[in-house]
Amino acid sequence: MEFDISGAKIFARIPTGIPVLGDILITETLVVSWIVMLIITGLCIFLTRNLKVEKISKRQAVAEMIVEAATNLVRNNTGGTKFDNLIPFVSTIFATSIVSNLISLIPIFRSPTADLSTEASWAILVFIMITANKIKAGGLLGYMKGFTEPIPVMTPFNILSELATPVSMACRHFGNILSGIVINGLIYAALAIASGALLGLLPGAVGDFLSHIPILSVGLPAILSVYFDWFTGAMQAFIFTMLTIMYIANAAEG
């Protein structure tokens, strides 16, 4: 039995004719990311249809609970309503992250977060918002001066520290999700091989038939999937969201 853990598949290449840019790749990560966006958009449309002030539906009640949870998450970690403008951005990051992590529960889909480019794009957006808030709080000159503190010789280290923020956010999330996929894949493949070897010891046609059925692969991979996909996926989405809130809030405070 073969089990591919080599990475996202490339479905198509679109030549750009520009040597620097190379070809535009339509990858498995890109396609599944579109599916994730469609799922989130569909849920938003479904939950926000026919909104009412009184006698609200169960669907609207769920929508209000989600909005209230997102609002409380931001306000409880920033000390008030000052950063309410972050709520839509933070909610989008969390929703995209958790759906991307959990979509791998469907066997035909590979989680987009198992591709570093996904987390890197999120981290770049967060980094831009952090930098914009720092400049807004202290001005451009104040932002540049901050790299020379407490003494000018620390400037290279301060620059590295600034760049390390998006890198660490992206790599932390990516590493946890990818490791789960790799471990699941290795265990599934190992159990399939063990199943074929053990059942192949049975005499006659029965052993020959059962050796081609990965019986041992049923059960344990599913249990591991509950941990790596559900628990770790939800936890990493929460951690990335919390770091986003704290970094941007701290930047705005100067």
Residue ranges and their predicted role:
Residues 1-254:
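Selective transmembrane helix interface/packing segments
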